Regions:
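Immediate post-signal-peptide N-terminus of mature secreted/exported proteins
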Residues: 22-55
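Mature-region segments of soluble proteins
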Residues: 37, 49, 56-164
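Short amphipathic alpha-helical segments enriched in leucine
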Residues: 11, 39-43, 66
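N-terminal export signals
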Residues: 4-24
């Protein structure tokens, strides 16, 4: 295992073991690594916007995919799509950033299934970027701050409509 992948693996393991999310512990580490890489390709850090790592897109996705209210079809598409992607492109994690981006762009041009998979990951990445931090993304309101968003009031005190 390359040093870089080892670091990613240990980071993802820390995410899993620091939570009480049962489904996350059932997601293979390679699936998490691929999802993390794809999110970082879709949401790169720019001079004005945070990248997927900064707004914690993977943590948001894992936290929310594990909740009972998460759409089952979306969960299936994300997890099975990632499994299929790994099966078709097992070398993905060994590619450099440019090659990874080119591969993602190529598959969404040639496969409706891949396009819907990437689209769904993008959808939840946008949610992670702009949702209230209580849901696990938008770490320290980083995305809100990057667009000078005025925070809505009242902010949620608990997640998913739980009673206070």
């Amino acid at each position: 295992m390359k040093r870089r992948n080892f670091i990613k693996f240990t980071t993802i393991s820390a995410i899993l073991f620091s939570t009480n999310i049962s489904i996350a512990k059932n997601i293979p580490s390679q699936t998490l690594l691929v999802l993390d890489e794809v999110l970082n390709i879709i949401f790169p850090k720019t001079s004005t916007m945070p990248g997927a790592k900064e707004f914690k897109a993977l943590e948001y996705l894992i936290k929310n995919i594990s909740h009972k209210t998460f759409d089952d079809e979306d969960k299936t598409l994300i997890l099975d799509g990632t499994k299929d992607f790994i099966g078709s492109f097992s070398q993905f994690l060994t590619l450099n950033e440019k090659e990874k981006k080119e591969l993602i762009l190529e598959i969404i041009k040639n496969s409706a299934y891949a396009k819907s998979w990437v689209s769904k990951i993008t959808y939840y990445g946008i949610e992670a970027m702009f949702s209230d931090p209580i849901y696990g993304g938008n770490f320290n309101q980083i995305a809100w701050k990057s667009i000078n968003h005025a925070v809505g009031i009242p902010r949620p005190l608990k997640t998913y409509g739980q009673k206070i």
